[in-house]
Regions:
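Short, amphipathic alpha-helical interaction segments positioned at domain boundaries
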Residues: 83-115, 175-203
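Sec/Tat signal peptide C-region and signal peptidase I cleavage site
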Residues: 16-23
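Short acidic, hydrophobic short linear motifs in intrinsically disordered regions
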Residues: 34-48, 115-131, 219
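Positively charged n-region of N-terminal signal peptides that target proteins for export
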Residues: 1-5
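A cross-kingdom marker for long, charged
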Residues: 227-272
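Short amphipathic alpha-helical interaction segments
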Residues: 50-65, 136-148
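A short, conserved structural fragment
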Residues: 64-75, 154-162
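Bacterial N-terminal signal peptides
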Residues: 6-15
């Protein structure tokens, strides 16, 4: 399988005509934001980013030297000793400072009567708005919106937070400027820090509960893992949803579109 993956990488690099990566990003950094998973989809992205097949070959050989490396289907998941899984690093054409975002964000007291203080985004409304203002079709609007969510969840400018598992937030909450002046801000920031600190361990442990092409990710056991990994310090009952959105927006799901959620790929799952 390793040989096939290397051949695929060579072909892809030839097609793109680029063998030089960005000077400030190593291959390991790049793969880390792809879930430390080397396979068909990430090879395409690595080639587009200018990472050469020699570096990919060397990384796979390094992984071959440890029993911790996971091989599943056409994928290789590098061990934590070589690569730590980070939240997906993606960038959307929709920016949090764009006028469409501002127009579809509530006032900070817009949901006060319901007990929620914060600036909440009308996500479906935003997807409809950018189709009009930018001439995008539904699939392009969905792609950029999911990337927008993943990007800003990663930076901490968005959250989907409540400490009550029986309560659903009004929407994604913007946490910039005056919108960050909310009673739960310290708890939100702590939950974000815990999520990112434990991201590698949570993704790797949960993958054992998810069969690629059949199951959903994260699994129903994810929040139990969060409780154990954070020793009960996490207060966000919806961390599982944040992680799902981050991985979908980061391209860790195959076949996502405006009408289809798609299915997870490694490192989120294992093939039978």
């Amino acid at each position: 399988m390793r040989t096939l993956i290397i051949i695929a990488a060579i072909c892809l690099l030839t097609a793109t005509g680029s063998g030089r990566a960005a000077a400030n990003e190593t291959l390991t950094d790049f793969i880390s934001a792809q879930g430390c998973a080397i396979g068909p989809a990430t090879l395409v992205r690595a080639a587009e980013a200018g990472h050469g097949h020699d570096a990919i070959d060397a990384l796979i050989k390094q992984a071959d030297a440890t029993d911790e490396t996971i091989r599943t289907g056409d994928w290789i998941v590098l061990p934590s000793s070589i690569c730590r899984i980070q939240p997906p690093d993606v960038h959307s054409k929709i920016q949090i400072t764009d006028p469409e975002v501002a127009a579809l964000t509530s006032d900070i007291d817009g949901y006060a009567k319901l007990g929620d203080r914060g600036c909440f985004l009308d996500g479906p409304g935003l997807m409809e708005r950018v189709q009009v203002t930018r001439g995008w079709d539904r699939n392009r609007a969905n792609l950029e919106y999911m990337r927008f969510l993943a990007e800003n969840l990663r930076t901490g400018d968005l959250a989907f937070y409540t400490n009550d598992p029986l309560s659903t937030p009004p929407g994604f909450q913007i946490l910039r400027g005056d919108c960050a002046d909310v009673p739960e801000i310290d708890a939100i920031r702590q939950s974000q820090a815990l999520r990112d600190r434990e991201f590698d361990a949570l993704i790797r442990e949960d993958a054992a509960n998810v069969i690629c092409g059949r199951d959903d990710s994260p699994s129903y056991r994810f929040m139990d893992l969060v409780m154990r990994r954070t020793r009960g310090e996490n207060t966000n009952a919806w961390m599982v949803f944040e992680v799902k959105i981050m991985t979908i927006g980061g391209g860790w799901y195959v076949g996502n579109s405006a009408t289809q959620k798609g299915t997870p790929r490694p490192p989120l799952c294992r093939f039978q």
